């Protein structure tokens, strides 16, 4: 009883205050939703949404009043309320505060020295805030929006790493003693490990925070989202504000208007079309021109032809140079060597040939220049001025860039100048297989060396050591460079200096026209090679949702949904009367040619990789069985043909044939990917798009196509009749029945009735019988 009396007295005392009485009688104690959450066992279905709802209130958090007063944090800053002098009913000596109070504490509070560290920790979030400030909002339109759920990157990163690579980087950066054996990624990118260690050294950060920073710096945060339009990471982080099922908010995001981003996009597209043209055994130059003229890019809200963009740009990268040479456009006096861009400043060298021996057996020739020349070079963030003469790099000054970029730039300049011991004796690890491509083309020795330094960090440093190590002696334009690419090392590389700022590229008003060979080598009027396909960096898997590839050879570069549709459209166009068309190959039972059609090969990369062998076995069995029994539908054969390209392999089949984007087709069953109707066999629907099945001749009228069957009449369907091609009709005897493909997926049985008969009479009878049979 005494306990209840005590509670009653306390309640009476509290009710003396009007505000407290109202809270005790009308409202709830503290936040009801929070109270309910912590006093029930119900699992929160959407904790993220609840947190956002709670943080949207004016004062969603509480703070210690004494600490606020000691830190001299005002109640208001820049017209934004930070906290109010109202005690929280759930915790004594705490008052209500806003989220802005935390920002004030971090950047204007007593620990202001930590502000730079905080900006580094939340670098990705602050970057997102800055990008949102750059958005140019436009009109809001109401329309039906065709959205596709796709895996997209929601955060732009300077360098993208896989999850396993990020974990390796975290271990080797933070826990060197406990790190596992070095993976191939660590061996190839040890310079990045050292850079990260130096970046976070002597900073007041615990290892958990640094691990978080590393993950956010290299992880693009991929998500499956319903998207439309271009799928740049800068746009995907705002996709929720740019459109829904029935509305679109027009806006120019930071990534779309960024000049550097557009330049990188164009380089990626040019690299793709160059590599695709190089894969052609013959006429690579003409193929490249076809690919360029059939491609367009979206710049903001405008669709522009790739051909125009290439001719307008002043980019001197090797991929753009090759494309511009193919189009006959003028260029400045520039050249490229691998991923390094070069521009000659002065001098004119004379070519001299020399020989180096591979494994002491095979002699390989290479060229060098006997006269002195000066060049400007650029690789990623590093730039350089250097001079070459004979087989040596006389001197080099490197400006700007991180240590790793400076090292790689120096190594490429050494190879370009044929400097170092490895142009006298080849490295022992270079084998005969490194001297040619998969297609059997010979690789020049300088490019063999370029590939060699890319294989491991040890190879790169071995080449740099061949430059020669001397006591540190600062140069005129900057400090000496050590073997690790840093300044003011105890031991430095011979005649290599560093300056803090970047070196500006010298202007060149003189324009030249380059010729492009079928080997995709661009050379000037004197025969000097300016760029070659070997200069292109290794291909990366990049998808282009804001680029339109119209050429059928480039179908695999489109987004997968469009590529599947275009692939089926190309297969349907093969339903003709030619010897190499699908009906003729079926009639001849030439399965090998059927499975290796160019259209089938183009769709091969769209098949789920880990199941392609199993799908091929099932699809080939379906095709051969149906053709052998004579009970088949051309529509169904077209559906499974893309899955027949690969070598068959035993395995469990689930009943569906999946593409790599998780869409699928099912034999004998219509779905949104591939569907057709027996009532109207003239059309096939792929992803809702109607594709017309062609007739056997280039005529739009069914009756005139039958005029070619003079001496035959349509009869009742006979599955026992042999399937023949149009060319084999001359061998059919009087009274014999044959089956023939007549167009739009239809197969009819014909009987030889006479050796000669008026075509018009046959047409009238045949048309009537076909209409009756339908």
Swiss-Prot record:
Influenza RNA polymerase is composed of three subunits: PB1, PB2 and PA. Interacts (via N-terminus) with PB1 (via C-terminus). Interacts with nucleoprotein NP (via N-terminus). It comes from Influenza C virus (strain C/Ann Arbor/1/1950). One of its GO terms (cellular component) is host cell nucleus. This is Polymerase basic protein 2. It comes from the Viruses. The gene is PB2. Keywords: Cap snatching, Eukaryotic host gene expression shutoff by virus, Eukaryotic host transcription shutoff by virus, Host gene expression shutoff by virus, Host nucleus, Host-virus interaction, Inhibition of host RNA polymerase II by virus, mRNA capping, mRNA processing, Viral transcription, Virion. Plays an essential role in transcription initiation and cap-stealing mechanism, in which cellular capped pre-mRNAs are used to generate primers for viral transcription. Recognizes and binds a wide range of cap structures of target pre-RNAs which are subsequently cleaved after 10-13 nucleotides by the viral protein PA. Plays a role in the initiation of the viral genome replication and modulates the activity of the ribonucleoprotein (RNP) complex. GO terms for molecular function: RNA binding; RNA-directed RNA polymerase activity. HAMAP family: INV_PB2. Its main location: virion. Belongs to the influenza viruses PB2 family. The keyword Ligase does not apply. It is found in: Virion; Host nucleus. GO terms for biological process: 7-methylguanosine mRNA capping; cap snatching; DNA-templated transcription; symbiont-mediated suppression of host gene expression; symbiont-mediated suppression of host mRNA transcription via inhibition of RNA polymerase II activity; viral RNA genome replication. The keyword Signal does not apply.
């Amino acid at each position: 009883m005494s306990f209840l009396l005590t509670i009653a007295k306390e309640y009476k005392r509290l009710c003396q205050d009007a505000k407290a009485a109202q809270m005790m009688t009308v409202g709830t104690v503290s936040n009801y939703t929070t109270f309910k959450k912590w006093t029930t066992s119900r699992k929160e279905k959407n904790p993220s949404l609840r947190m956002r709802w709670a943080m949207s209130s004016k004062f969603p958090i509480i703070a210690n009043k004494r600490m606020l007063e000691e830190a001299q944090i005002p109640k208001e800053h820049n017209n934004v309320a930070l906290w109010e002098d109202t005690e929280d009913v759930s915790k004594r000596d705490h008052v209500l505060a806003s989220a802005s109070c935390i920002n004030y504490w971090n950047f204007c509070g007593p620990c202001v020295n930590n502000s730079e560290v905080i900006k580094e920790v939340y670098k990705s979030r602050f970057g997102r805030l800055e990008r949102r400030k750059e958005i140019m909002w436009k009109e809001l339109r109401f329309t039906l929006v065709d959205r596709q759920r796709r895996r997209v990157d929601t955060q732009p990163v300077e360098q993208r790493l896989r999850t396993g690579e990020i974990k390796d980087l975290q271990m080797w950066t933070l826990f060197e003693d406990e790190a596992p054996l070095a993976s191939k990624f660590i061996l190839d990118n040890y310079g990045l490990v050292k850079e990260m260690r130096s970046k976070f050294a002597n900073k007041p950060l615990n290892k958990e925070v640094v691990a978080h920073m590393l993950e956010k710096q290299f992880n693009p945060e991929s998500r499956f989202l319903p998207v439309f339009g271009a799928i740049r990471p800068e746009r995907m982080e705002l996709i929720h504000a740019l459109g829904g099922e029935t509305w679109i908010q027009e806006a120019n995001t930071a990534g779309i208007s960024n000049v550097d981003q557009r330049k990188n996009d164009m380089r990626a597209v040019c690299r793709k079309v160059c590599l695709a043209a190089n894969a052609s055994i013959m006429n690579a130059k003409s193929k490249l021109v076809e690919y360029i003229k059939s491609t367009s890019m979206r710049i903001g809200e405008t669709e522009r032809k790739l051909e125009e963009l290439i001719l307008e740009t002043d980019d001197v990268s090797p991929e753009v140079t090759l494309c511009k040479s193919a189009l006959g456009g003028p260029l400045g006096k520039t050249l490229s060597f691998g991923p390094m861009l070069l521009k000659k400043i002065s001098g004119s060298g004379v070519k001299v040939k020399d020989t180096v021996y591979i494994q002491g057996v095979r002699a390989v020739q290479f060229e060098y220049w006997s006269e002195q020349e000066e060049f400007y070079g650029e690789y990623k963030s590093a730039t350089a001025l250097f001079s070459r003469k004979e087989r040596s790099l006389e001197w080099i000054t490197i400006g700007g860039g991180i240590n790793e970029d400076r090292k790689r730039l120096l190594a490429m300049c050494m190879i370009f100048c044929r400097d170092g011991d490895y142009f006298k004796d080849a490295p022992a690890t270079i084998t005969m297989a490194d001297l040619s491509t998969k297609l059997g083309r010979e690789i020049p020795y300088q490019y063999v060396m370029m590939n060699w330094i890319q294989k491991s960090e040890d190879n790169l440093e071995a080449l740099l050591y061949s430059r020669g190590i001397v006591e540190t002696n600062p140069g005129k334009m900057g400090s000496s460079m050590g073997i690790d690419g840093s300044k003011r090392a105890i031991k430095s590389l011979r005649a290599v200096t560093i300056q803090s700022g970047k070196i500006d590229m010298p202007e060149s008003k003189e324009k030249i026209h380059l010729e492009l060979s079928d080997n995709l080598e661009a050379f000037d009027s004197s025969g000097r090679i300016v760029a070659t396909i070997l200069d292109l960096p290794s291909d990366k898997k990049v998808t282009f949702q804001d680029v339109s590839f119209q050429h059928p050879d480039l179908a695999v570069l489109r987004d997968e949904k469009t590529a599947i549709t275009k692939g089926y459209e190309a297969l349907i166009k093969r339903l003709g009367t030619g010897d190499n068309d699908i009906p003729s190959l079926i009639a001849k039972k030439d399965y090998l040619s059927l499975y290796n059609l160019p259209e089938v090969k183009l769709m091969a990369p769209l098949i789920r990789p880990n199941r392609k062998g199993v799908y091929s076995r099932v699809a080939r069995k379906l095709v051969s069985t149906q053709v052998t029994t004579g009970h088949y539908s051309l529509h169904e054969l077209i559906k499974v043909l893309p899955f027949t390209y690969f070598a068959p392999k035993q395995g469990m089949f689930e009943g569906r044939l999946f593409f790599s984007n998780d869409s699928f087709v099912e034999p004998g069953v219509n779905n949104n990917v591939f569907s057709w109707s027996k009532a109207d066999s003239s059309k096939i629907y792929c992803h809702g798009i109607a594709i017309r099945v062609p007739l056997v001749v280039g005529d739009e009228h069914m009756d005139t196509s039958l005029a070619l069957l003079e001496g035959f009449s349509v009869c009742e369907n006979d599955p026992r009749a042999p399937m023949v091609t149009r060319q084999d009709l001359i061998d059919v005897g009087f009274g014999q029945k044959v089956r023939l493909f007549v167009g739009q997926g239809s197969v009819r049985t014909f009987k030889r009735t006479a050796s000669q008969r008026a075509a018009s009479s046959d047409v009238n009878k045949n048309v009537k019988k076909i209409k009756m049979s339908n």
